[in-house]
Curated annotation (Swiss-Prot):
Substrate binds at residues 57, 73-75. GO terms for biological process: alanine biosynthetic process; pantothenate biosynthetic process. Binds 1 pyruvoyl group covalently per subunit. Its cofactor is pyruvate. Keywords: Autocatalytic cleavage, Cytoplasm, Decarboxylase, Lyase, Pantothenate biosynthesis, Pyruvate, Schiff base, Zymogen. It catalyses: L-aspartate + H(+) = beta-alanine + CO2. It comes from the Bacteria. Is synthesized initially as an inactive proenzyme, which is activated by self-cleavage at a specific serine bond to produce a beta-subunit with a hydroxyl group at its C-terminus and an alpha-subunit with a pyruvoyl group at its N-terminus. This is Aspartate 1-decarboxylase.
Length: 118
């Protein structure tokens, strides 16, 4: 049997922009994608700590070093610049492998600098 587990998360990211007119997605600094293992075009859940809103979208790459967390398209109505969010991805593993699996967790500060990655 396969079970769905958290693959990776960016914890307490700060939204830097919200663009209603862009055609969807969440733009994430390439450094943060690399640190977390989140892939461009990978499905992600975004959990807004500030408002409690939750939505699903996909990740796109923002320039390396930009510290951008930019919510685009219709989902831009669910965030405001400065909101704290959690960006989560999931994967499926056989139950036996899942018992020993550890996800990647990247904790961010208010400026989207990495405080801790494990």
């Amino acid at each position: 049997m396969l079970v769905t587990l958290m693959k990776a998360k960016l914890h307490r990211a700060t939204v830097t922009q919200a663009d209603l007119d862009y055609e969807g997605s969440i733009a994430i600094d390439r450094d943060l994608l690399d640190a977390s293992g989140i892939l461009p075009h990978e499905q992600v859940d975004v959990l807004n700590i500030t408002t409690g809103a939750r939505f699903t979208t996909y990740a796109i790459e923002a320039p390396r070093g930009s510290k951008v967390i930019g919510v685009n398209g219709a989902a831009a109505r669910l965030v405001q610049k400065g909101d704290k969010v959690i960006v989560v991805t999931y994967g499926m593993l056989p139950a036996e492998e899942a018992r020993n699996y550890a996800p990647t967790v990247v904790l961010l500060d208010d400026g989207n600098e990495i405080k801790k990655a494990a």
